[in-house]
Structures are given as C-alpha cells and as structure tokens.
Amino acid sequence: MKIFFLLYFAVLIWSAINPKDYFTWFLEVIPAIIALIVLALTYRKFKLTTLIYSLILIHCIILMIGGHYTYAQVPLFDFIKEVFNQDRNNYDKVGHLAQGFVPAMIAREIIIRKNIIQIEAWRNFFIVCFCLAFSAFYELIEWWVA
C-alpha cells in the first residue's frame, strides 16, 4: 500500500502543478480523491485484492492526467493523433474504458466475496447494469457541471 500512496500522491501533486484550468482539474480529480477517502475508510474492514487496488490506482492516474491537460489535449495522444492521422485526441476513450472496466471489476469482487448474487448469469447481468447506471450518472454530473 505504500507504493500505492506514493504513486497516487506523486501524480496528484504533479497534476495540480499548473494544470490547463484549475476548475476543470478539480472536477476531473475529485472522483480520485473521493475514491482514496472511501478506500482508506474501508481498508481495515474489507480489503480488496491487489489487482483491484492496482486498477483503482490506474483509473485515478487516468483521471489526474485528464484533469491536468484536459482530456482533449493529453500530449501523448496528440502525438498518436498525428502519427495515425486521426481527427482528434482519443484520451477520453481511455478514460471511458477505465470508467466502465474498473467499476465492473470492483462490483464483481464485492458481489462474489460477499456472496450477494449466487447465480453467475444474474451476477454478470447485475454488474453490467451497475456499470451502465454508474457511468450514466457520471455523464449526467458532467453534463450538469458543463
């Protein structure tokens, strides 16, 4: 967990130094800060697997990078855009992938370990529904703020 916190705070501090826009940075990074608080509060009672903590860290880093540059202007993806002659910077697609995949993995782990839904087909259906609802909620918040 020390490496988790070290990487988390290193990227958080880096992302807060001269971002493209501080208000946008705050909006993009606040979910990562909330996630850290939730993880800290639940760590002793319900430890997640190393895989899940790693995926959460990767998702937080994606949010922090997007907050620092804005999703449309991440330099590596500008380079990729130019090399492959694309019309736009596709970093937001990485963010959307993480927004769907990481919550699905978290929900799956919690549901399996707590034995909430025993039938695999229903469990998988619920996880997909949860992630769709969570992502839709997140998009509504983004729309409301914009």
Regions found by a protein language model. Give the residues of each.
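Membrane-interface loop-to-helix entry segments
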Residues: T24-I30, D87-A107
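Internal alpha-helical transmembrane segments of multi-pass membrane proteins
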Residues: N115-L132
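Active-site-proximal inter-transmembrane loops
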Residues: D78-V94, W122-I127
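Alpha-helical transmembrane segments of multi-pass membrane proteins
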Residues: S15, I56-G66, A104-R108, F130-E142
